[in-house]
Amino acid sequence: MAYETAFLGASTVFGKYWTKRRYFDYLIDKDNFKITFGRSFGMMVYLDNAVANGPAKVRADVEADTRATNYLINHLADIKPELTVFVTTCDMLPETADENTPALEKSDDPYVQNRINLYRELNRQYGRVLNVHLPEIANPSPDFNPLLATLLNPDQSDSPLPFAPLEYHQLYLPQRIMGDVDRCIPLGIPAIIPAMPPLTTTELVKLLNPALAERLRAPETTDPRGSDRTSIHSFQWLDPKDGYLVTKEDEMELLKFYFAP
């Protein structure tokens, strides 16, 4: 029925957290995905594969990701949601984007192209969509965040850390997702980048595992810049409006609370 709700990706990190705190009529994963076919929903939460399983894990098998993405695209028309909350990555957006920045049309990176394809088709076929673009997920699993995984469980070698020291990271805690989405839905906005203040690799090392600071290598001109995306809707969370949902000081305190020894 049209007032029923569904969560696609219920057994994932985001899904477990969200569905334990909010009731959904249908908890969907790949094993029972077909039961959504032919149904209408008042609201559906839809997790992109990279958000559900981790960007690093998905990148490790892009062919499987392409098959999964194409399967989902081919069956979008079989599901009829009134409102779709699509939780995806920022890979289809430039590194300094906000919600007014057009998404990329194509990419030479097949992983990014899969994100683009599902984003484009879902928004084309469904009428009312809230796109939630996560810059970087603060999950210490190497599938989600190799940097956090290394800082919390480093090897015992003296070799330099395999991360650019000045690269920006915008770490988004999964625990925020339900509250942030609940705040966005009444606004009627089509997209939100829940942007956290950017922290460099060096800042994160000193914050979460200072003993590794001596293993930071020197910066190189070819190093990635990282993410410094902002939100035009940040004033809904924080005043004055600076593009971020929290202050840098609060972000650092939260990361220390969850991840510092």
Give the location of each predicted region.
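Structural signature of the Rossmann-like NAD(P)-dependent dehydrogenase/reductase core
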Residues: Y46, L83-F86, L130-E136, I193
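Short, solvent-exposed loop/turn segments at secondary-structure junctions
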Residues: S11-V13, D48-N53, C90-L93, E136-N139, ...
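N-terminal Rossmann NAD(P)H-binding glycine-rich loop of SDR-like oxidoreductase domains
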Residues: A2-F24
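Active-site regions of enzymes building and remodeling cell-envelope glycoconjugates
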Residues: R22-K34, G38-Y46, D61-V62, E82, ...
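NAD(P)-dependent short-chain dehydrogenase/reductase
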Residues: D108, I116, R120-R176, D182
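NAD(P)H-binding glycine-rich loop region in Rossmannoid oxidoreductase-like domains
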Residues: T5, N32-T96
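Conserved catalytic-site region of short-chain dehydrogenase/reductase
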Residues: F86-E99, P110, I137-P142
